């Protein structure tokens, strides 16, 4: 399977799955395509997912968004910056393979619709995204 990631809109809710005694999946809205085989995500320092990927770096990131994006990216994750912003770590996923879930029988027209209801959280999210974008170029 090819490992080239398509583009997806800013704010797309992705689902990060990590290993452990049982699978663990969480929504992640701060996910940035940083190249054809690289994704950057931001995780709060206290997240169980962060502890899990430190113990076992194998992860899967499901992405569903407008533009008919329906895929799961499989790879290894590592923390590349512990304090991206206060209490948030930057995680790099080196994608080894991409499973495309698209079919001729349907089209993904939109991802999850969501918005911040707290202005402080919204401002922090913008700060996190800007910091991820600064890490994106290699």
Task: Annotate each PLM feature.
Residues 1-138:
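Binding-site signature for planar aromatic cofactors or substrates
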